[in-house]
Amino acid sequence: EPYMLASNLPGVAVLVDRNRVKAGRYAVKRLGCDTLILDDGFQYQKLKHSIEVVLVDSTNPFGNGNLLPRGILREPVRNIRRADIIFLTKCRGDVSAVKEEIRRYNTTAEIVECNHTPKVLKDVWSREEFPLDWLQGKTLCTLSGIASPKGFENSLRHLGAKVVWCERYADHHRYDSSEVLYALNRTADM
């Protein structure tokens, strides 16, 4: 993810550090940044926040209501009351019930409906681009370390690919060579 962000945002500093305060200070003092955007920063209260932004998946807004590791929530649903802007993602239909649920906790935040739409396929190493119809009729195996692998897999299916095998890892998973080799060997047999 950080590599992808840095590649697609020239001139924007992308820092990765478990100590976000240290990274924030470095960005401001050494790199001259005047704005910091944190991934998963809503629950990170050690840095002063000017604007609280939250993304809510409209297809599974609050999961089973439990916090990690028993559920998908990083903090209780009621804490959404701190949000200034709520992006309601994966909106493909009527989301009024989800908005009503959000309004139970936050009556003032702006709610923005959005949807993920792929535009192009890109080789991460060569940066070569392919049109979306390149997937039409292709048989695919997926290897993913993202929060919502089913959404990724369904996007491939909607683009006409036949997804026959999926290897899913936790969000932000760091692949090691044995995992990649396993996937390559598994797909070679198909």
Feature annotation, model-predicted:
Residues 61-190:
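C-terminal accessory "lid"/substrate-recognition subdomains
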